């Protein structure tokens, strides 16, 4: 039994010495396809949850991290903008054609998107936004 305790301590120490803790957050590449998808999903959630008449659009991914849980958590720090397209007139699929005015409202958001690909399930578990500048 003592051997298992020593092994557990060694595993934790190796993880800490490598800068990683099992189940901890790991920096992710903002250009990664899965990170981009999580950021897009978070932006759609922001748009649907807001009281604005207009869609929100992803402008930039500033930072991203991942965490292995029962699936993967993607924590994304994103910048979004309020577009000129009304939610009642333009479906989300056509959002690419919607512009964000130069002097329009922009937001900085922190979101956690939980993905369980084998189910499949994607859920925003945290979304906090504030107006930029």
Swiss-Prot record:
Keyword Signal applies: yes
Keywords assigned: Antibiotic, Antimicrobial, Disulfide bond, Protease inhibitor, Pyrrolidone carboxylic acid, Signal, Thiol protease inhibitor
Site feature: Reactive site: 23
Classification via SUPFAM superfamilies: Cystatin/monellin
Tissue: Expressed in hemocytes and slightly in heart.
Domain of life: Eukaryota
Record's signal peptide: 1-19
Pfam family for this entry, one: Cystatin
Cysteine-cysteine disulfides: 85-98, 109-129
Modified residues (Pyrrolidone carboxylic acid): 20
Family, similarity comment: Belongs to the cystatin family.
Functional note: Tight-binding inhibitor for papain. It has an important role in the protection of cells, antimicrobial activity against Gram-negative bacteria, defense against invading microbes, and response to external stimuli.
Protein name: L-cystatin
Organism from which the protein derives: Tachypleus tridentatus
